[in-house]
Regions:
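N-terminal glycine-rich FAD/FM-binding segment characteristic of electron-transfer flavoproteins
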Residues: 1-340
Length: 340
């Protein structure tokens, strides 16, 4: 009762990294609230295969739903599992990944339970709230923080009266870490038939095709990212060359992606990928809130910008004032000279 729950996604018997990141965050939230962390995982043939991918992150109780028809994911069975389980357990918080599955499952569950859901959160915190209209004071609510209105503001959203408080978070936003404290580590295997009616299995997945990743932007130790200031698709060729020399990957701002200069899968930010490289080189990027949300935890941030007052310069460790056209070729030249 009143615990923090994390829905864990799987591919076969492999737990998604975003779920492990959320377990880490969920453990911190549970500690702050003085409650337990519980996890839910559903699939086929997963008993004995997923427990040790979940429990080390500080889970007090793990609910493993194992039955034919639960993998590959389809909407109805997984929705029934969470809705019926939550009616029994009455969690105060539920977290899930802002993935294809999470974006389908989260709204279904929140709608069924008439609770709120905040998508694509960049921060999750615990805090108090005073409602100026009702003059009610609420203790220890979940602050669901995310950029809003096109990234022009950072909104803090609360759900005072309805439970669970639900939020989705993109992969890479939270850091995952094995929990060093004590947790119960209890595992239960509920009877799936008590939670999922046979009619939920009406949809069958006949075949699946998973496209191989074109790059490793999320895991790159060096990211060279370009914004609208790069000027053209040809300008990005210079960034690809620099990234190749540095053994890094190329990222982009939303403005550059919208201009058609680079593919969407390279977009860094609130509506793209969240990265944690050792070095992030921002080329011609102004630094809108939604972009900064996806790269602010980089080890070293280098800004190349013709505008010395660009917002991104406020978080940059090093600033090179100049155009991308004049600075990047020099970086390539001098790196080649000094790396021989």
């Amino acid at each position: 009762m009143n615990n923090v729950f994390v829905y864990c996604e799987i591919e076969g018997t492999i737990v998604a990294e975003v779920s492990q990141e959320l377990l880490t965050k969920g453990r911190k939230l549970a500690n702050e609230l003085g409650v337990e962390l519980e996890a839910v995982v559903a699939g086929s043939g997963i008993k004995g295969n997923v427990e040790q991918q979940i429990l080390p992150y500080g889970v007090d109780k793990l609910h493993v739903f194992d039955a034919e028809g639960l993998f590959p994911y389809t909407s109805a069975p997984h929705t029934s599992i969470l809705v019926n389980l939550f009616k029994e357990e009455k969690p105060q918080i539920c977290l899930m990944g802002a993935t294809v599955i999470g974006r389908d499952l989260g709204p279904r569950v929140s709608s069924s339970l008439t609770s709120g859901l905040t998508a694509d959160c960049t921060q999750l915190e615990i805090g108090n709230y005073d409602d100026v209209k009702t003059r009610k004071h609420y203790e220890k609510l979940l602050y669901q923080i995310r950029p809003a209105f096109g990234g022009n503001i950072v909104a803090t959203i609360v759900n005072p009266d309805h439970r669970p408080q639900m939020a989705t978070v993109r992969s890479g936003v939270m850091q995952k870490a094995i929990y060093e404290g004590e947790a119960k580590g209890e595992v239960v295997y509920p009877d799936v038939a008590k939670y999922v009616p046979e009619t939920d299995y009406v949809v069958k997945v006949i075949d699946r095709h998973i496209e191989a990743a074109k790059h490793n932007l999320k895991g790159a130790s060096i990211v060279v990212a370009g914004g609208y200031g790069v000027g053209s698709k040809e300008g990005f060729d210079q960034l690809f060359q620099l990234a190749k020399e540095l053994h890094g990957e190329v990222g982009a701002s939303r403005a550059a992606v919208d201009a058609g200069w680079v593919d969407h899968d390279r977009q860094v930010g609130q509506t793209g990928v969240t990265v944690h490289p050792k070095v992030y080189i921002a080329c011609g990027i102004s630094g809108q809130i939604q972009h900064i949300a996806g790269m602010q935890d980089a080890g070293i941030i280098i800004s190349i910008n013709s505008d010395p007052e660009a917002p991104i310069n406020k978080i940059a460790d090093y600033i090179i004032t100049g155009t991308v056209e004049e600075v990047v070729p020099k970086l390539i030249k001098y790196y080649k000279q000094n790396s021989k």
